[in-house]
């Protein structure tokens, strides 16, 4: 139950969904489960009427992995017909296979996608070709760094710091080179912020609102704080 919960949390899903899934599994196993869920940790207790078991679990980083989330939901939905007849070892082996699922796209592809998106935002915010090019390069490198560090399970704020720093340095470096070679003016620095837009965490913003609406205050406030600090 706890492992399924922490795996769901690692996919970026909200506390209400994690708790609902843990309760579904607990009910099928004849247990009662209470859980305190945050952005990156779960403290839960399971009761069987005679004994209880408590455990605290935590993550080093958070992100979004819809492929893994989909497989976990299938596992939970089929648990009543398949999972209850499996041994503990078989269940953990099945979860091991799910845990190995990575995102559909490589860091290179995600970096290129972020570059296109931030370049487009630069255009929408009134930037010209110079700003768009610099933001494209900065965002691409920055998101590539963030994805690579995330795959190696570095801490959340180290990933944010390193990726934003990379984006800023690439933008500033390209801008200085273009000033020397092409003689562009200082006013083109307006696209500097656009090179960091990839770091804005839209998913935690959405899930924080859902958690707060369901009065899950701890998770909602932690997600909202993370989203604001990331900006």
Briefly describe each language-model feature range.
Residues 1-89, 97:
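Soluble N-terminal domains of membrane-associated systems
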Residues 61-117, 122-127, 131, 225-231:
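Alpha-helical transmembrane segments and their cytosolic membrane-interface
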Residues 103-207:
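Core alpha-helical transmembrane segments of integral membrane proteins
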Residues 154, 185-186, 211-223:
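Juxtamembrane helix-boundary/capping and inter-helix hinge elements in multi-pass membrane proteins
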Residues 4, 191-195, 227:
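Hydrophobic alpha-helical transmembrane segments of multi-pass small-molecule transporters/permeases
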Residues 13, 17-20, 67-70, 86-93, ...:
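Conserved active-site and cofactor/substrate-binding residues in soluble primary-metabolism enzymes
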